[in-house]
Amino acid sequence: MIPQIKKILFATDLSKNSAYAFFYAIHMAKRDEAKIVIMHAIEPIAPMLVDFEDFKYQVAKDRWEETVIKFKERIQDISVKADARTGVSSVDLISNILIRPGNPVEEILKVADEEDCDVIVLGSHGKGFLEKTFLGSVSSSVLLRTRKPVFVIPLPSEDTTVDLV
């Protein structure tokens, strides 16, 4: 018997690829009457900067705070477009939005367990505004290290129009 999906972890790097994957998470949540946990992992402030010069630490801290603000704005933009496209209010489906400092793979696995998620949804081969590859090697590593079902969603073919960014 296939277990019922009650909670979906949607991990995002805020790329077009992961925004498209959000449609899948919304569709799954609506179909299964499930909730969505949205999470994004950000590289933490380097420990050496904490004890280093105050100026460098402040720059790193400001960059972190700026990234958090961009993340929240981006999630809002993606949600509005997803709502218009799917006809479903994603706000009603989202149970939590998390921004975690740390390695994306480690944080995805931790959040999936902490939030008791039944499945994980990822976009494939995304590249976020921090210009680090996120959901190519990340999706592979998550697949290898979790016992939960993982949905890796590629962008549609070039013939398909996707207005997400």
Predicted regions and their residues:
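Structural beta-alpha unit
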Residues: 1-3, 45, 80-120, 157-165
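Small/aliphatic-rich secondary-structure junction motif
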Residues: 2-58, 87, 165
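General small-molecule cofactor/ligand-binding pocket signal
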Residues: 39, 96-100, 151
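Redox- and metal-dependent alpha/beta enzyme cores, enriched for Fe-S-associated oxidoreductases
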Residues: 41-44, 70-72, 83
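A short acidic, glycine-rich active-site loop
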Residues: 57-73
